[in-house]
UniProtKB/Swiss-Prot annotation:
Keyword terms: Magnesium, Metal-binding, Molybdenum, Molybdenum cofactor biosynthesis, Transferase
Job of this protein: Catalyzes the insertion of molybdate into adenylated molybdopterin with the concomitant release of AMP.
The protein, known as: Molybdopterin molybdenumtransferase
Gene behind this protein: moeA
Family recorded in the similarity comment: Belongs to the MoeA family.
Domain of life: Bacteria
Cofactor descriptive note: Binds 1 Mg(2+) ion per subunit.
Reaction catalyzed: adenylyl-molybdopterin + molybdate = Mo-molybdopterin + AMP + H(+)
Organism: Haemophilus influenzae (strain ATCC 51907 / DSM 11121 / KW20 / Rd)
GO term, biological process aspect, one: Mo-molybdopterin cofactor biosynthetic process
A Pfam family the protein falls into: MoeA_C
Database matches in InterPro entries: MoaB/Mog-like_dom_sf, MoaB/Mog_dom, MoCF_biosynth_CS, MoeA-like, MoeA_C_domain_IV, MoeA_C_domain_IV_sf, MoeA_linker/N, MoeA_linker/N_sf
Annotated pathway: Cofactor biosynthesis; molybdopterin biosynthesis
EC nos: 2.10.1.1
Reported cofactor(s): Mg(2+)
Length: 404
C-alpha cells in the first residue's frame, strides 16, 4: 500500500494544470484562480500624499525658527496649487497631494496655533516624515498577483485600487458527485429496515461548494455493475472530476474498481491510512476519478487529505500547501495499532501554562460521525507508532476553513 505522501505525490504528478480560461469582472472572479501574472498599470500611491492631518513643511524654512505662517490648504481631491512663499507651511489633510518641495508633514497634534495666525511646531521633523511617496505600495510594472493565485477578498480590492476591472481566470472546475449502495436513501425520505441516509453525497457537495467548484449532482447508484458502468460513462462527459462514495472495498457488491478498470484506468486503490484505506484514484476517458470509502468518517478524511489537494491542482493553483502541524500534549491514553497513519478526531486548546494540549473526542470508529462535530483537529499518529500514553507528545493538524 502507498503511504499518504506517496499517494498524494502520485496524484499531483499526473494531474495537468487547466488550460481553459475566461475573463471575469472582479465581483464574479471572487475565489477563482488567476490564469496569468497581473501587472500593475500604475503607481500606488500615484502621487506623493500625506499620511496625517497636519502641516506640510520645507525643512529649509525651519532652520532658524519653528514658527511659520500658513500659506493655504490641501485637501484630498483638491490640492494646494498656489505659489508657496518661503517661511510658510501648508495645512494638509490625510490623503491629500503634498505641495511640490515638501520635505515632511507635521501632525496637527504637534502644532500650536498662535493668536496672530502663525503656527509653532514642538520639534523639528525628520525628512519624509508622514509622507507617502509615489509607488511606495506598488510600482508600475510590478507583478501584484502571480498566475495560480486565488482571487480573495484581500487581493481583489488591490486589483480594484489599480483600476483593473476584469481578470483572466481558469474556468470553474466541474465536479460530478454520486453515491453507491442499495442501502442508501435520500435525506428527508423515510427509512425502511436496513436502510441509512446518504450523508456522503450531501457532505461532499458541501465541501465542493466551499472549494468553489461547480457541483453536478449525479444521484444515487444501486449496487449493480451495469448501472455503475452506465453512470461512469455518462458522468465523464459532464464533469472534469467524478467523485463517488462507497463501492471501493472488496465486498461482493463493491463494483467501483472493476468498472473503473473497464471504462478507464485505476492508478491506485488502497492507502495506508486510518480511516480511509479503500480510496480509489484513476481516470475515465474525459475526467479524473476519485472513489471515497462508504463510511462517513473515512469519506471525509480522504476528501480532506487527498481530494482537496487534487482539486487545488485542477483549479490551477500553483502549489498546494500542506496543512500546518503542531506538537501537543495528549491528555489521555490513545489506542493505536502499528501499520497505518492514523487520523483521530481531537480537540486542542491552550492550557494555563501556554502549552497546546489535545484530547480525543471519543470512540474513533469510521462509522461514528458525531465525533467530528466536537473536534477542531486531527490527532496525527505516525504509521510506525503504537499506543500513546497520557502526557506524551503527539502531532495535531488543526482543521482549516474547509471543516470550519
Amino acid at each position: 500500500m502507498l503511504t499518504l505522501d506517496q499517494a498524494r505525490s502520485k496524484m499531483l504528478e499526473q494531474l495537468p494544470f487547466p488550460t481553459q480560461t475566461e475573463y471575469l469582472n472582479l465581483q464574479e472572479a471572487a475565489n477563482r484562480i488567476c490564469a496569468e501574472d497581473i501587472i500593475s498599470p500604475i503607481n500606488v500611491p500615484s502621487f506623493d500624499n500625506s499620511a496625517m492631518d497636519g502641516y506640510a513643511v520645507r525643512l529649509s524654512d525651519l532652520q532658524q525658527s519653528l514658527t511659520l505662517s500658513v500659506a493655504g490648504k490641501s485637501f484630498a481631491g483638491n490640492p494646494f496649487q498656489e505659489e508657496w512663499p518661503s517661511k510658510s507651511a501648508v495645512r494638509i489633510m490625510t490623503g491629500a497631494m503634498i505641495p511640490e518641495g515638501t520635505d515632511a508633514v507635521i501632525m496637527q497634534e504637534q502644532v500650536t496655533l498662535n493668536e496672530d495666525g502663525t503656527i509653532t511646531f514642538s520639534e523639528l521633523p525628520k525628512p519624509n516624515q508622514n509622507i507617502r511617496r509615489i509607488g511606495e505600495d506598488v510600482k508600475k510594472g510590478d507583478v501584484v498577483l502571480e498566475q495560480g493565485a486565488q482571487l480573495t477578498p484581500v487581493s481583489l480590492p488591490l486589483l480594484a485600487s489599480l483600476g483593473i476591472a476584469e481578470v483572466k481566470c481558469y474556468r470553474q472546475l466541474k465536479v460530478g458527485v454520486l453515491s453507491t449502495g442499495d442501502e442508501l436513501v435520500e435525506v428527508g425520505k423515510p427509512l425502511q429496515s436496513g436502510q441509512i441516509y446518504d450523508t456522503n453525497r450531501f457532505t461532499v457537495k458541501l465541501l465542493l461548494e466551499k472549494l468553489h467548484c461547480e457541483v453536478i449532482d449525479l444521484g444515487l447508484l444501486p449496487d449493480n455493475e451495469a448501472e455503475f458502468e452506465k453512470a461512469f460513462i455518462a458522468a465523464q462527459s459532464q464533469a472534469d472530476l467524478v467523485i463517488t462514495s462507497g463501492g471501493v472495498s472488496v465486498g461482493e457488491a463493491d463494483f467501483t474498481k472493476a468498472v473503473l478498470e473497464k471504462v478507464g484506468q485505476v492508478n491506485f486503490w488502497k492507502i495506508a491510512i486510518k480511516p480511509g484505506k479503500p480510496f480509489a484514484f484513476g481516470k475515465l476517458e474525459n475526467a479524473w476519478f476519485c472513489g471515497l470509502p462508504g463510511n462517513p468518517v473515512s469519506a471525509l478524511v480522504t476528501f480532506y487529505q487527498l481530494v482537496q489537494p487534487l482539486i487545488a491542482k485542477l483549479q490551477g493553483q500553483k502549489q498546494w500547501k500542506k496543512p500546518p502541524h503542531f506538537s501537543a500534549i495528549a491528555t489521555m491514553n490513545l489506542k493505536k495499532a502499528v501499520g497505518r497513519l492514523d487520523f483521530q478526531r481531537g480537540f486542542y486548546y491552550i492550557n494555563e501554562q501556554g502549552q497546546i494540549e489535545v484530547q480525543s473526542v471519543g470512540f474513533q470508529g469510521s462509522h461514528l460521525f458525531s465525533a467530528f462535530v466536537k473536534s477542531n483537529c486531527f490527532i496525527v499518529l505516525e504509521q510506525e507508532r503504537g499506543n500513546v500514553s497520557a502526557g506524551e507528545t503527539v502531532t495535531i493538524e488543526p482543521f482549516n476553513h474547509l471543516l470550519g
